[in-house]
Each structure stands twice: as structure tokens, then as C-alpha cells.
Swiss-Prot record:
GO molecular function: transcription coregulator activity
Any GO CC annotation of this UniProt entry: mediator complex
Record family assignment: Belongs to the Mediator complex subunit 10 family.
Description of how the protein assembles with itself and partners: Component of the Mediator complex.
Alphabetized PANTHER family for the sequence: MEDIATOR OF RNA POLYMERASE II TRANSCRIPTION SUBUNIT 10 (PTHR13345:SF13)
The species this protein was found in: Xenopus laevis
UniProt-recorded name of the protein: Mediator of RNA polymerase II transcription subunit 10
Subcellular localization: Nucleus
């Protein structure tokens, strides 16, 4: 899988470098540099074709649109992953707290119901296979 990305990365780096060189030629264009300009434009077209070939290998990869927003804002796209993980961790802690609270509530409820309805709770515990209330 990484090989696909490495291949795409190589093509993109070459493409960006070609655009940089093309910008230099265009910014100081001389009629004598027309041949070099044509050559760079041909390299540019071939680079786009190479990138398009990579697209076929990566058709099953999806990127969240928010990642592109990060890039457009000049932020590191890896921050998106970090922030997603932090949000997931916070949500997991919140859910764990709710689960712990419900377990405590169940334990207290069973204790109190055992005091008020000892026979019924004994039957309940027998059906559930519990000898004693969970802690």
C-alpha cells in the first residue's frame, strides 16, 4: 500500500518541481527560451498523465473534505488526524463515565431492591445466576 503512495508522491514532487522551473522560465521569458518553455510544458503534460495513472491505483482511497480545508488554511493535514483522535478519546472518556455511573446505579438499585423486596430479588438473582449483587 505504501508503495502506491510513494509512487504518487514521487510524481507529485517532480510535477511541483517542473511547475517551479516553468515559473522561472515564464517570469523572465525571452524568445530564445521558447524551446525550453515548450519542453517544460511537455514535461508538465506527461507529469499530469503520470499522476492520472496513479489515480487508478488509489481509487479506493477516500480523504475527508475537512483535510482539504486544513490544507487551504495553510494548516498541517496531520493536525486533522490528531484532532480527530483527541475528539474520539474525549468521547470515549465521556461514554466510559456514563457506563461507570450506570454500573454503580445498577449495583445500588439491586441493593435497595433487595432490602425492600428480598424474596423477589432472590428469585431475580437466581434467574440471573448471581449469588451476590455486582460491585
Amino acid at each position: 500500500m505504501a508503495e502506491k503512495f510513494d509512487n504518487l508522491e514521487d510524481h507529485l514532487e517532480k510535477f511541483v518541481e517542473n511547475i517551479r522551473q516553468l515559473g522561472i522560465i515564464v517570469s523572465d521569458f525571452q524568445p530564445s527560451s521558447q524551446a525550453g518553455l515548450n519542453q517544460k510544458l511537455n514535461f508538465l503534460v506527461r507529469g499530469l498523465q503520470d499522476i492520472d495513472k496513479c489515480r487508478q491505483q488509489l481509487h479506493d482511497i477516500t480523504v475527508p473534505l475537512e483535510v482539504f480545508d486544513y490544507i487551504d488554511q495553510g494548516r498541517n493535514p496531520q493536525l486533522y488526524t490528531k484532532e480527530c483522535l483527541e475528539r474520539a478519546l474525549a468521547k470515549n472518556e465521556q461514554v466510559k463515565g456514563k457506563i461507570d455511573t450506570l454500573k454503580k446505579f445498577k449495583s445500588l438499585l439491586i441493593q435497595e431492591l433487595s432490602k425492600v423486596f428480598p424474596e423477589d430479588m432472590a428469585k431475580y438473582k437466581a434467574v440471573r445466576g448471581e449469588d451476590h449483587p455486582p460491585s
